[in-house]
Amino acid sequence: MNEFEKTNIFLQIDGVELNISAISRKGKKPPIVFLHGFGSTKEDYADIIRQASLSDYPFLAYDAPGSGETYCSELEKISIPFLVKTALAVLDHANIEQFHLAGHSMGGLTALLLSHQNPDRVLSFTDIEGNIAPEDCFLSRQIIEYPAANANEFFERFVERTLHTPAYSSPLYSASLRHKIRAEAVEGIFSSMVELSDHGELMDKFVSLPCPKMFMYGEQNRALTYLGYIKSKGVRLSEISE
């Protein structure tokens, strides 16, 4: 079995010091780059090494600034545009020119903007419930709907609300949030997700990407209003059952 190796990547983005925690595997084919979602980490994708059909593919996954084992010197500066710059810097550090891209939630939005800015580098894009419309801000819009006195107060109340969300595995997700995301990073991430979802023309950016595209979603989100539209534009849909 071709296992992965764990490494650290030291970067500076907009004057912010980063120590990126990453896992990767070498190989001869174009690599798969994974960008995790909000409240998740690189380990979400480590089981790629257990998939025989992907055994020939190298891959790279890392903890985004504000998440997991990655160190960030100024958490308040993190936003989706900041995460896009980070992704580009990580790719350049790893000498990755062309790649297959998969992103979930926050990582899906980051991946979309990364693909839009670098269409010649992305060979395929699997968007796992990443934001492409205002209706996708069911978590991030809470930064507006539930104002709080400070970052820690918002985060603690967010964790409690998430515990009771009627979505599969919400209690498990809620229980892990304090271990996977820094409270001080949440406002910048959520605010930029809302701004981009409302005004960033994400749908147009997504359907106009020249690479093959897949949109994955859970069965609880099959009522998303745009699924038929993106399918008509050539996006492959993949519904995941419970």
Residue ranges and their predicted role:
Residues 187-241:
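Conserved serine/cysteine hydrolase catalytic core
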Residues 44-46, 70-76, 137-139, 226-227:
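Conserved catalytic-core motifs of eukaryotic protein kinase domains, centered on the activation segment
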